[in-house]
Amino acid sequence: LTCLNCPEMFCGKFQICRNGEKICFKKLHQRRP
């Protein structure tokens, strides 16, 4: 199945697909330069 982008206001910009389900989670650490 296809995973759609998660709303930024709901969960950060990170998302993963498991068993065809969409799971969102916030970013815990910032990107390193």
UniProtKB/Swiss-Prot annotation:
<dbReference type="GO" id="GO:0090729">
    <property type="term" value="F:toxin activity"/>
</dbReference>
<keyword id="KW-0964">Secreted</keyword>
<comment type="function">
    <text>Possible voltage-gated potassium channel (Kv) blocker. Decreases amplitude of compound action potential and conduction velocity in toad sciatic nerve. Has only mild anticoagulant activity even at a concentration of 5ug/ml. Shows no cytotoxicity towards human cell lines.</text>
</comment>
<comment type="similarity">
    <text>Belongs to the three-finger toxin family. Ancestral subfamily. Orphan group II sub-subfamily.</text>
</comment>
<keyword id="KW-1199">Hemostasis impairing toxin</keyword>
<dbReference type="InterPro" id="IPR045860">
    <property type="entry name" value="Snake_toxin-like_sf"/>
</dbReference>
<keyword id="KW-0800">Toxin</keyword>
<protein>
    <recommendedName>
        <fullName>Neurotoxin Nk-3FTx</fullName>
    </recommendedName>
</protein>
<dbReference type="GO" id="GO:0005576">
    <property type="term" value="C:extracellular region"/>
</dbReference>
<keyword id="KW-1015">Disulfide bond</keyword>
<keyword id="KW-1203">Blood coagulation cascade inhibiting toxin</keyword>
<keyword id="KW-0528">Neurotoxin</keyword>
<keyword id="KW-1220">Voltage-gated potassium channel impairing toxin</keyword>
<feature type="disulfide bond">
    <location>
        <begin position="6"/>
        <end position="11"/>
    </location>
</feature>
<feature type="disulfide bond">
    <location>
        <begin position="3"/>
        <end position="24"/>
    </location>
</feature>
<keyword id="KW-0872">Ion channel impairing toxin</keyword>
<keyword id="KW-0632">Potassium channel impairing toxin</keyword>
<dbReference type="GO" id="GO:0015459">
    <property type="term" value="F:potassium channel regulator activity"/>
</dbReference>
